[in-house]
Curated annotation (Swiss-Prot):
Subcellular location: Cytoplasm
Gene: mnmG
Cofactors demanded by this protein: FAD
Stretches of the chain forming a coiled coil according to its record: none
One protein family per Pfam: GIDA_C_1st
Keywords annotated in UniProt: Cytoplasm, FAD, Flavoprotein, NAD, tRNA processing
Cited Gene3D superfamilies: FAD/NAD(P)-binding domain, GidA associated domain, C-terminal subdomain, tRNA uridine 5-carboxymethylaminomethyl modification enzyme MnmG/GidA
Binding site for NAD(+): 273-287
A cellular component term, taken from the record's GO annotations: cytosol
NCBIfam families associated with the record: mnmG_gidA
Binding site for FAD: G13, G14, G15, H16, A17, G18, V125, S180, Q370
Name of the protein: tRNA uridine 5-carboxymethylaminomethyl modification enzyme MnmG
GO BP annotation list: tRNA methylation; tRNA wobble uridine modification
Length: 629
């Protein structure tokens, strides 16, 4: 039977991609249905209890700037907050928070249940309704059919998921959850390229069996950072420390002597694992010269005794896992409460997607999260938001939107996936972005909130706060520009006391702030330049904008030069054999990838600058030289 009411957008899966997709579509006013196999696991942290980190924190801030959920949820659930790379420049600083799993899940579910235009329904999905190469709905395991104008697949590791512990394996979407086998089979019938990937998780330890007295503590930052531009530290729950231990030669001997029982090394697992989150087996074998690896013991929550030992992801048999755990300092009597495991799952080649994350072959079908070959909650959330907003726009007969590489880490992520694809789980790093100085955590709202407002993602409260911040920045910069001190002024002595070289000519507040030894906080304690802004976010922007003004202007010039050709569109139906002068290799790669723009084409391995020049000349001759907005 068909459900009596049609929807604009259906989201299949309630993880980090699915929840952001559902919230985005509903915020934009579209009638949205979120289908999940279990309402109680909405927003579940399947692996590590943490949000953020290098590159990942940037994505969370961008999701927040577009009105998303993740930053707000972690501000309510974070039990330890830190700024990574705090001593480095603002481009690579990143926020990271340990999470209380239960509080995080509660925050996500509360937000979903209070979101207008959003309905949640508990049933596993087994089929899609496809009519004339267009997806128009979904079918649940009890045969109930839902119709919609767009469908977003955010199914994580559930597609034909297979869990491995030692040489034993069984079907599962993650520990304790069933896999999605009928849906996997259905998707394999569609004109989509499919592959297998693998990820893993460490055993969980009973905190009561760990001797923390012999371990080093790691505390969070004080004052505590916040993730959301709308948040403040008073929202954070009680803060707790993490602890550090290490593997040792005994640990490594245990691993090496049991590799024949590892499903990876025995050839049982076919899927490729994440390069930047390797199993402890991989670390020991790949870095054979190292006699120890640092392991972080991270609490899973304020009301839980479970500890997440970050750094020993493994699929070795349980008896070997026990030996590994008990070989480390402080863990000699530790008890495992959940075994570690590896999981293999289907993913679909993201090169078959448009930058909006809609399928090139099936109209109305969007993909987001691990199904696209990524790893990580943050990467999933960012894709979910993009897929959700574009599904909403499609259902409203509007053009899709995707950020440029120069505009957001989300733009880098999507462009990398859609242009280059991936053969291993993709993780975001700041090093993947060409324009890191422009794509900082601190200015994510300045880059994206206005666009989010135009798209219908940003509510009135966030918009008002954003405009107030802009006004504070502009007003303060004008004040510092117009407030000046001369070497002969009475205030000069007070100013000189904070400078490595005394004033030799008249200087404005901005001139002084550009000096390496001067900070905004210090400057605004000086009589001529007091008082400081009470808006800490605006104050941070004033300092960064002034200190890095020259570098930022130079990078903006680079972006504008690059964008002249970046946005030149390539016809989706173009057969590159028509373009004379291209090599057979380039023709084959362009016909295989079908890039949407010259920018995408230029990033395909083997497509040379000379080939790009030939393409531009050909487009001009054909009268097809068009640029996207």
């Amino acid at each position: 039977m068909f459900y009596p009411d049609p929807f604009d957008v259906i989201i299949i899966g309630g993880g980090h991609a699915g929840t952001e997709a559902a919230m985005a579509a509903a915020r934009m006013g579209q009638q949205t249905l979120l289908l999940t196999h279990n309402i109680d696991t909405l927003g579940q942290m399947s692996c590590n209890p943490a949000i953020g980190g290098i590159g990942k924190g940037h994505l969370v801030k961008e999701v927040d700037a577009l009105g998303g959920l993740m930053a707000k949820a972690i501000d309510q659930a974070g039990i330890q907050f830190r700024i990574l790379n705090a001593s480095k420049g603002p481009a690579v600083r990143a926020t990271r928070a340990q999470a209380d799993r239960v509080l995080y899940r509660q925050a996500v579910r509360t937000a979903l249940e209070n979101q207008p235009n959003l309905m949640i329904f508990q049933q596993a999905v087994e089929d899609l309704i496809v009519e004339n190469d267009r997806v128009v709905g979904a079918v649940t395991q009890m045969g109930l059919k839902f119709r919609a104008k767009a469908v977003v697949l955010t199914v994580g590791t559930f597609l034909d998921g297979k869990i491995h512990i030692g040489l034993d394996n069984y079907s599962g979407g993650r520990a304790g959850d069933p896999p999605s086998i009928p849906l996997s089979r259905r998707l394999r019938e569609l004109p989509l390229r499919v592959g297998r990937l693998k990820t893993g998780t460490p055993p969980r330890i009973d905190a009561r069996t760990i001797d923390f007295s012999v371990l080093a503590q790691q505390h969070g930052d004080n004052p505590m950072p916040v993730f959301s531009f709308m948040g403040n530290a008073s929202q954070h729950p009680q803060q707790v420390p993490c602890y550090i231990t290490h593997t040792n030669e005994k640990t490594h001997d245990v691993i090496r002597s049991n590799l024949d029982r590892s499903p990876m090394y025995a050839g049982v697992i076919e899927g490729v694992g994440p390069r930047y989150c390797p199993s402890i087996e991989d670390k020991v074998m790949r870095f054979a010269d190292r006699n120890q690896h640092q392991i972080f013991l991270e609490p899973e929550g304020l009301t839980s005794n479970e500890i997440y030992p970050n750094g020993i992801s493994t699929s070795l048999p349980f008896d070997v896992q026990m030996q590994i755990v008990r070989s480390m300092q402080g863990m000699e009597n530790a008890k495992i409460v959940r075994p570690g495991y590896a999981i293999e799952y289907d993913f679909f080649d993201p090169r078959d997607l448009k930058p909006t994350l809609e399928s090139k072959f099936l109209q109305g079908l969007f993909f987001a999260g691990q199904i696209n070959g990524t790893t990580g909650y943050e990467e999933a959330a960012a894709q979910g938001l993009l897929a959700g907003l574009n599904a909403a726009r499609l259902s409203a007969d509007k053009e899709g939107w995707a950020p440029a590489r120069s505009q957001a880490y989300l733009g880098v992520l999507v462009d990398d996936l859609c242009t280059l694809g991936t053969k291993e789980p993709y993780r975001m790093f700041t090093s993947r972005a060409e324009y890191r100085l422009m794509l900082r955590e601190d200015n994510a709202d300045l880059r994206l909130t206005e666009i989010g407002r135009e798209l219908g993602l940003v509510d009135d409260e966030r918009w008002a706060r954003f405009n107030e911040k802009l006004e504070n920045i502009e007003r303060e910069r004008q004040r510092l520009k117009s407030t000046r001190v001369t070497p002969s002024a009475e205030a000069a002595a007070e100013v000189n006391a904070h400078l490595t070289a005394p004033l030799s000519r008249e200087a404005s507040g901005e001139d002084l702030l550009r000096r390496p030894e001067m900070t905004y906080e210090k400057l605004t304690t000086l009589t001529p330049f007091a008082p400081a802004l009470t808006d800490e976010q605006a104050a941070e922007q004033v300092e960064i904008q002034v200190k890095y003004e020259g570098y930022i202007a130079r990078q903006q010039d680079e972006i504008e030069k690059q964008l002249r050709n970046e946005n030149t569109l390539l016809p989706a139906t173009l057969d590159y054999r028509q373009v004379s002068g291209l090599s057979n290799e380039v023709i084959a790669k362009l016909n295989d990838h079908k890039p949407a723009s010259i920018g995408q084409a230029s990033r395909i391995s083997g497509v040379t600058p000379a080939a790009i020049s030939i393409l531009l000349v050909w487009l001009k001759k054909q009268g097809m030289l068009r640029r996207s907005a």
